[in-house]
Amino acid sequence: MAITTAASRLGTEPFSDAPKVELRPKASREEVESVIRAVYRHVLGNDYILASERLVSAESLLRDGNLTVREFVRSVAKSELYKKKFFYNSFQTRLIELNYKHLLGRAPYDESEVVYHLDLYQNKGYDAEIDSYIDSWEYQSNFGDNVVPYYRGFETQVGQKTAGFNRIFRLYRGYANSDRAQVEGTKSRLARELASNKASTIVGPSGTNDSWGFRASADVAPKKNLGNAVGEGDRVYRLEVTGIRSPGYPSVRRSSTVFIVPYERLSDKIQQVHKQGGKIVSVTSA
């Protein structure tokens, strides 16, 4: 699976030329176990799973040849385990983004896809929402009955929209990253750009772009100091913060908040942010 020459910086290098994980006829026990691990890793967004959380019955059916990989994927996606991780505590649009990522290996291409699944869930429920991905022609033509879903959004394919390549990197934040261990939490990553029909700039998942999980705020947060320096010197910094929770602080539903701070007050501001429970995701020159 050739991706790009920047694979190491985008966190996709482990998938370069990696073979598809497939359950073949007369597979050995080790091969079956490898398939089970691959399904859990991909469908659960690389989140940790306890031994007590494993789907013992579905695993047994797969080992005995009474369940295809496709149906095992369906069992995981419909399980209480999946719901606890991604359904009960997430915005509906976030769940749809993750369903596309986990079950079809790509990001939504446009807002109409999200609207369709919102309507489907409202009218027919959770199980119908999951079935719509796994029973789709797209799933069948790419994974069939016995291939574990993988990230298709990293490569160019027939019928793929270019925006999908950029958007998959809003959902995928590195090989070792988990879908439940990101700065933006359970909020939608793509709602704003899908609504405006724009694709965001790709931001690498590691230190290549100032911090691990950071991307510049897409709203009105200032990106530059628009006036004169306000300190004794001319060094002014842009401090981007997320997750501030403190009495009297406005609760604004957005991924980050920006402060323009002179150098001599930078240390004090950082301490204040930490006391308010915030996370500093970027410090750049303003």
Curated annotation (Swiss-Prot):
It is found in: Cellular thylakoid membrane. The keyword Membrane applies. Residues 2-180 form the PBS-linker domain. Gene3D superfamilies: Phycobilisome linker domain (1.10.3130.20). The keyword Membrane applies. Rod linker protein, associated with phycocyanin. Linker polypeptides determine the state of aggregation and the location of the disk-shaped phycobiliprotein units within the phycobilisome and modulate their spectroscopic properties in order to mediate a directed and optimal energy transfer. This is Phycobilisome 32.1 kDa linker polypeptide, phycocyanin-associated, rod. It comes from Nostoc sp. (strain PCC 7120 / SAG 25.82 / UTEX 2576).
